[in-house]
């Protein structure tokens, strides 16, 4: 097994899943969706969605269409944390990975809203896995995964 080749395949699959679930800018909220997408597409290793896919494969598998919404969601949650961490009230970073941070590109208020939007949209995205549930067991597994995902960005996880 060629580790580099396999890892690149996982990263490409993660990139595709993330891109597939990005919010589509609509007239009323186009500026927020644009800032959200800018943030998510700013680069990165995509380690979290790759690890999620690998774990799903190792521990019994899961249909691709059921795991992909969670892969995108976990990357959105990670990105939300970076967007908020870069804000002037936190680290005041103006560049990340050689690009302007979200608040530096769009302004502080839009940076806050983009981060908030990513966190909320992550749950909406993960819930799309229910569309692919084949039976009650799938529904239970998705509900448990969603509960676990929702518990980690808050006070019992990233904030605690």
Residue ranges and their predicted role:
Residues 1-22:
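N-terminal amphipathic/basic leader segments beginning at the initiator methionine
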Residues 22, 26-160:
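Mg2+-dependent prenyl diphosphate-binding active-site environment of isoprenoid biosynthetic enzymes
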């Amino acid at each position: 097994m060629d580790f580099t080749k396999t890892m690149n395949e996982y990263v490409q699959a993660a990139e595709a899943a993330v891109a597939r679930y990005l919010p589509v800018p609509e007239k009323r909220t186009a500026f927020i969706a644009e800032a959200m997408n800018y943030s998510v597409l700013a680069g990165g290793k995509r380690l979290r969605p790759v690890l999620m896919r690998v774990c799903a494969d190792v521990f019994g598998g899961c249909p691709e269409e059921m795991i992909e919404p969670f892969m995108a969601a976990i990357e959105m949650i990670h990105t939300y944390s970076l967007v908020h961490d870069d804000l002037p009230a936190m680290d005041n970073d103006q560049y990340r990975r050689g690009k302007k941070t979200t608040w530096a590109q769009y302004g502080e208020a839009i940076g806050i809203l983009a981060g908030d939007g990513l966190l909320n949209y992550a749950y909406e995205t993960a819930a799309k896995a229910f569309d692919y549930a084949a039976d009650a067991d799938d529904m239970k597994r998705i509900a448990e995964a969603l509960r676990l995902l929702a518990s980690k960005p808050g006070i019992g996880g990233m904030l605690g």
